[in-house]
Structures are given as C-alpha cells and as structure tokens.
C-alpha cells in the first residue's frame, strides 16, 4: 500500500471498513503513532487486541476488532478531527467529552499520545487527533 498523506485517517477508515465487513482483524503498516492510538483504543475496550509483526524489515500491525455478544461492533463511530491540512489544537479545558462520556478523544501531547481524560487530569492540551464512541 502506498503511504497516504494522512496515516491516522487511513487507520480509522480501515478499522471502519473492516467492522462494516464484520472482519475479525485488519492488517496495516505499522507506525509509532498508529500503535499509540490503537493501544489507547484497546485500553478502553474498543479493540480486542493487536500484534506488531516484522517481516523483511517491514513492520505491520494486525488489529483484532471488538464485537459485542450480539455481534455488533463495539465502535459506533471513529472521527478524525485534526488533519494535515487543518490542525486542531485544544487546551486541557477544551478537551471534549465524547458521547456522554462513553466515548474517548485521543490527543497527541508533549507527553505522548493520551486519551482525553488522562490529558485533562494532567492539565495538558495538544493536537486533537480523533474521537471514538
């Protein structure tokens, strides 16, 4: 796959499409940023788990999707906020509460990629990467 200019949007789209198709997992190229986002989604129960594989010096990720008991995707929506063409930065006080606090925001901060609640607790803002609920 050729690298898109927005690897985060690509990550979200691939997860979205895999869920629509009821796939168990999705494979994609690894990056530190992608893994950081996926780790947060897993922590919050939005993804089952993930693996990072290395083959001929190329790293890939396999992301295992999470479905509820009635086989519905746990993730209802993945929304990219900040984009390469239009970056969105928020101070700690403006970090959004997502979907009545059932969802999460993901930020890139001076202390790494964090979910909104953690960034808010540390009183640091950052680039608002995406919302998930």
Swiss-Prot record:
The keyword Cell inner membrane does not apply. GO terms for cellular component: ribonucleoprotein complex; ribosome. GO terms for molecular function: rRNA binding; structural constituent of ribosome. The keyword S-adenosyl-L-methionine does not apply. One of its GO terms (biological process) is translation. Keywords: Ribonucleoprotein, Ribosomal protein, RNA-binding, rRNA-binding. InterPro entries: Ribosomal_uS8 (IPR000630), Ribosomal_uS8_CS (IPR047863), Ribosomal_uS8_sf (IPR035987). It comes from the Bacteria. One of the primary rRNA binding proteins, it binds directly to 16S rRNA central domain where it helps coordinate assembly of the platform of the 30S subunit. Belongs to the universal ribosomal protein uS8 family. Part of the 30S ribosomal subunit. Contacts proteins S5 and S12. PANTHER family: 40S RIBOSOMAL PROTEIN S15A. This is Small ribosomal subunit protein uS8. It comes from Chlamydia caviae (strain ATCC VR-813 / DSM 19441 / 03DC25 / GPIC). The gene is rpsH.
